[in-house]
Amino acid sequence: MTNLRKSHPLIKIINHSFIDLPTPSNISAWWNFGSLLGVCLMLQIITGLFLAMHYTADTTTAFSSITHICRDVNYGWLIRYTHANGASMFFIFLYFHIGRGIYYGSYTFMETWNIGVILLFTVMATAFMGYVLPWGQMSFWGATVITNLLSAIPYIGPTLVEWIWGGFSVDKATLTRFFAFHFVLPFIITAMVMIHLLFLHETGSNNPSGLNSDSDKIPFHPYYTIKDILGLLLMLLTLMTLTLFSPDLLGDPDKYTPANPLNTPPHIKPEWYFLFAYAILRSIPNKLGGVLALVFSILILMLFPMMHMSKQRSMTFRPLSQCLLWILVANLIILTWIGGQPVEHPFITIGQLASISYFCIILILMPTTSFMENKLLKW
């Protein structure tokens, strides 16, 4: 009789994905983030489900229902702050995961990479809609500003904005539909994650050397299950420390003021994980230009496979490209800082320079450097 995990139609799929999966023997801790993102997604769905049981998607009671969750529901404060800070952890891991993909040339798995970029867009949309739900000042004005960007689309823009709002301003209809989308999108994300894994398992994992590892594979379990559990414990430690000691560290104080359409907050800004894109949006004085730059700042990831000029896959043995990538990381940190600053001198100039640098590094300097490294190696 064959082993049940190898013969049962359902368990067989799990076996091929998480147990007997042939995995390169040399993948580092940078490969932990995929599983951590999966855990984050599950955590967000579970905490979100419990929050949805007590939340009311109505402009008059939304803010009060959040207060009720934090004060009256058993461990409601814990569920609420785990959900909020869990989103921050999600984005930290997403950016690490993408950074690892760029560093080690994982984007050469075209299907996996492109599904990943679509996933990033979907997660960003979900997080934005979740930010609107507490119906504080930043929720209302954030929703107003970001949805208003669509009015920059020629011809159909203004009509599209009113259609999304369900009226002539951000109101009850907007909140209700945002709640509906925020609830359903994580399940769509889960389905897309499965497709992401399906494409990954067609090719097998990349590894730090960027070389073919078919000759040196080990089973995923127990080697990488135990390694993933270590990552999971470190993640839970960080998340719980953040949630229990300083739950509002990454948030905005304006969230605690109920939404008021007659009073604009001094600085409208999104959560920290969108600030780099927000800085790029603000650095262009033209509305349509800003929106295009915002979209392209993420969509540019789709171009990485086409712009890979090096004859080596990974950056492990390419010091010049490594330097450039770390300059890009520093540049993104500067953009994140600028996104949270008021629109005044010298922040405007710094933001514009950092935005230009961002696109120049990716579109011009990285391919040129790769080409140069090929020449240096006489290839």
Swiss-Prot record:
Keyword vocabulary terms for this entry: Electron transport, Heme, Iron, Membrane, Metal-binding, Mitochondrion, Mitochondrion inner membrane, Respiratory chain, Transmembrane, Transmembrane helix, Transport, Ubiquinone
Binding site for a ubiquinone: H201
Record GO biological process: mitochondrial electron transport, ubiquinol to cytochrome c
Chain sites annotated for binding heme b b562: H83, H182
Transmembrane segments: 33-53, 77-98, 113-133, 178-198, 226-246, 288-308, 320-340, 347-367
Assigned GO CC terms: mitochondrial inner membrane; respiratory chain complex III
Chief place of localization: mitochondrion
Note: Heme 1 (or BL or b562) is low-potential and absorbs at about 562 nm, and heme 2 (or BH or b566) is high-potential and absorbs at about 566 nm.
Name of the protein this chain belongs to: Cytochrome b
Organism, scientific name: Proechimys cuvieri
Gene it is expressed from: MT-CYB
